[in-house]
Amino acid sequence: PEYDEMRARGVTNHFSRVWIPDEPVESDEDFNKLMENIRAELDNAVKRVITCRPDYLVMGMSSETFWGGLQTSIELKKRIEDLSGLRVAMGSDACRAALACYGEIKRIAVLTPYWPVGDKNVRTFFTDCGFEVVRMKGLKCNGPVEIAYVTPTELVSAMKELDGTDID
């Protein structure tokens, strides 16, 4: 619903799911398997959605866009742009743009739904972008669907853990 709530008047959203099995994630190994499943299906999802001839492609999943750091993110974006023939926006782009709105901040805290292996890649990405990740908290969600079920109370609690005067 969030993407539909943000759409401009006259714009329609067309979705294509990256098909992955709804399997439990209980370890870094499981999280790596989830990432393999995403990679195996990402191109198919892009190919399906471009049949409606969209003007722009917004990727609503984030983990893959941070994986491997900034350079890998840039390469992924180029690959998806080449595959789709469209301009592409990704979660990693959105994070960089949002942080730029705050001026010259450098020291950040990051909250993710990921397991430690995912958090490591997010940290690498932000470090590559010139930020110092002072604190990070991964919620270790027990599966891709469970990310959507994190409660506002859980998020507020995690944000309080991350807060501090040592971050910008």
Predicted regions and their residues:
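N-terminal glycine-rich anion-binding loop in soluble enzyme alpha/beta folds
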Residues: 1-44, 111, 116-154
